[in-house]
Amino acid sequence: GTSGQAWHQDCPPDDPKYFNVNRLIYTMDIDKEKTGGQTLVMPGSHLKGLIPSMSEPFEEDKKVVLSPKKGSIVFLHGHCWHSVLPVTGEYRVSTNYRCASKGTPENITDIGIYRNIRYQFSTSSIVEERS
């Protein structure tokens, strides 16, 4: 198993016209009993801007739990607030293909926005602490 993934956005929502789209393809059933690792999403959050920091109100009770079946595809807007629950089985498999509209910066997903940090993947470094 793994510890899952904290609430985050895949790219900065600074400019709403620039974002990526994740296409998550599931090659196995993802469910609470067998695998864990369900994806949590906050409906409509792709329109709300920056995910709240740890000190700001966060209405987690409004989340939707996705438990895709084998062969399912999930489209996820890069500004959508989402997380992954801990994997409780041996493993969880999905394939993520990303795309973006023409004109979107190629490095749009280099900065991930978490509730406590902004993280730059290309340098493996925290670029901003959020409180």
Task: Identify the role of each PLM range.
Residues 1-68, 104-113:
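Catalytic core of non-heme Fe(II) oxygenases with the double-stranded beta-helix
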Residues 21, 72, 93:
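Residue-level detector of short, conserved catalytic/binding motifs and their immediate flanks
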Residues 30-43, 76-78, 121-130:
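Short secondary-structure transition/capping segments
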